[in-house]
């Protein structure tokens, strides 16, 4: 028998009255459940749960916790260092680390590889007949190319998009059979580097195409390339008329993918979406037989007609909301915690460095946390507006003033647990209560930007089951 509060249910939806009663019983006293559990459930640190039935909701297992399920497990499982036994078969967490040692680091960044794989599977299912490629550019949006590309390749992802040749080499090391496209295109004199790792450049101009064709022919190499066409973004790519004129002779250039990019897929009603899809359909007919790709993460949710032969899953893989006008359909991927290094007491009227006009209005306790803009925590666009927050103990607290290079200041005056705000303890900056999109909105940024800026001073933990 366990005391109240051992387990925490985080589901917003309870499917049936019986499920609600089962969860109430779980919260009240018992670590044993006779029957199936429909709710999403968190088993907290060093606690245990025995389910004599099926687990139909999602399950999070904290460090040191143990869960035994005698039936089937149909929900998503996030194992953060606990132990899971399903029908007498152990499912241990696979944990790898990177960066400085945890005791020496300013904070801890946990990256859930199981969630990334689940997000890819969800996007692939939504894309139906189209292949789902993974965009791992920018060091997998700051999350780490090798562990993420490796996990996705093992799951069945066959195609990856990277920023440059160094990133292509890193993907090739963990995905030896994958197709790899390099989005920054062909730099002069880099043909041999592409050939050595069997990667393909995304070609944006006749100049690049001519150099690539010369290299391929002179080296008698059958390497392919992607042709990128500008259908309305006005950034990179062949102008539409030039691409149409080039189509009759394109067969001899080894083009393996025709691609473009939607400019406003986050806004489903934007008229440019249908216009770009129509233009791309017309162009695809001229390049008959060559696979085509238009949709990025938001484009996958736009309409099936935007999917074509291949979709490019990027930010959504990492938990960023691809549908800003609706609830986030993706699983969260990261948890970021920072270390308290000092707790200050301020009298009314006192300020701190980088306070940008903030002053204590009452006797105030501030926790200084060793995370700052050098670690990628956002600073630009931030004014004192009560938007940036952190979780200290079980309470949501305001971050006051500007983040400095190495520090955040958090108002912990109202934290009731006297042990929560102590030097050495961790606070949550991104997690279940504060998503990456919440942090981005509060700092007038985007989820992609915040993720990509997360620095190398964190102790990184990659975990999966």
Language-model segment annotations:
Residues 48-49, 66, 106-108, 322-332:
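Short aromatic-glycine motifs in intrinsically disordered, low-complexity regions
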Residues 138-151, 195-197, 209-224, 230-347:
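Active-site loop/helix belt of alpha/beta enzymes
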Residues 116, 171, 258, 340, ...:
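Residue-level signal for inorganic ion chemistry
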Residues 161, 181, 202-203, 259, ...:
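Conserved beta-strand positions in the central sheet of alpha/beta enzyme cores
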Residues 6-8, 14-17, 98-200, 213-214, ...:
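A charged N-terminal "starter" segment
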Residues 5-103:
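Extended beta-solenoid/beta-helix repeat architectures
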Residues 345-465:
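C-terminal accessory subdomain/extension
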């Amino acid at each position: 028998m366990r005391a109240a509060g051992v387990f925490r249910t985080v589901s917003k939806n309870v499917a049936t009255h019986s499920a609600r009663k089962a969860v109430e019983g779980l919260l009240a006293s018992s670590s044993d459940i006779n029957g199936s559990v429909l709710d999403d459930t968190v088993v907290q640190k060093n606690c245990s749960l025995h389910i004599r039935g099926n687990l139909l909701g999602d399950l999070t297992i904290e460090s040191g916790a143990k869960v035994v399920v005698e039936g089937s497990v149909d929900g998503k499982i996030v194992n953060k260092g606990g132990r899971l036994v399903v029908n007498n078969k152990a499912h241990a967490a696979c944990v790898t680390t990177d960066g400085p040692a945890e005791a020496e680091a300013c904070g801890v960044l946990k990256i859930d590889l199981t969630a990334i794989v689940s997000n890819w599977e969800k996007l692939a299912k939504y894309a139906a007949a189209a292949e789902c490629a993974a965009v791992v550019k920018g060091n997998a949006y700051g999350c780490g190319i090798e562990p993420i590309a490796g996990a996705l390749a093992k799951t069945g992802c066959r195609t990856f998009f990277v920023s440059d040749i160094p990133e292509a080499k890193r993907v090739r090391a963990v995905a030896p059979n994958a197709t790899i496209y390099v989005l920054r295109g062909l730099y002069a004199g880099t043909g041999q580097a592409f050939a050595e790792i069997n990667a393909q450049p995304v070609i944006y101009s006749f100049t690049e195409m001519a150099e690539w064709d010369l290299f391929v022919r002179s080296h008698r190499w059958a390497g392919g390339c992607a042709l990128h066409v500008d259908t309305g973004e006005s950034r990179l790519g062949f102008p539409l008329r030039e691409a149409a004129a080039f189509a009759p002779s394109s067969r001899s250039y080894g083009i393996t993918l025709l691609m473009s990019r939607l400019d406003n897929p986050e806004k489903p009603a934007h008229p440019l979406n249908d216009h770009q899809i129509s233009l791309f359909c017309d162009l695809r007919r001229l390049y008959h037989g060559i696979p085509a790709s238009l949709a990025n993460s938001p484009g996958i949710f736009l309409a099936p007609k935007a999917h074509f032969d291949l979709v490019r899953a990027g930010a959504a893989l990492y938990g960023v909301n691809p549908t800003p006008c609706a609830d986030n359909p993706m699983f969260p991927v990261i948890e970021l915690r920072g270390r308290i290094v000092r707790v200050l007491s301020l009298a009314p009227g006192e300020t701190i460095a980088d306070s940008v006009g903030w002053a204590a209005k009452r006797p105030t306790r501030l926790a200084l946390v060793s995370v700052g803009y050098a670690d990628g925590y956002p600073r630009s666009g931030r004014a004192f507006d009560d938007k940036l927050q952190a979780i200290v103990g079980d309470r949501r607290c305001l971050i006051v003033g500007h983040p400095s290079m190495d520090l955040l200041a958090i108002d912990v005056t109202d934290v009731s647990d006297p042990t929560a705000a102590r030097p050495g303890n961790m606070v949550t900056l991104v997690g279940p209560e504060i998503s990456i999109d919440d942090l981005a909105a509060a700092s007038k940024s985007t989820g992609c930007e915040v993720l990509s800026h997360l620095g190398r001073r964190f102790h990184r933990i990659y975990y999966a089951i």
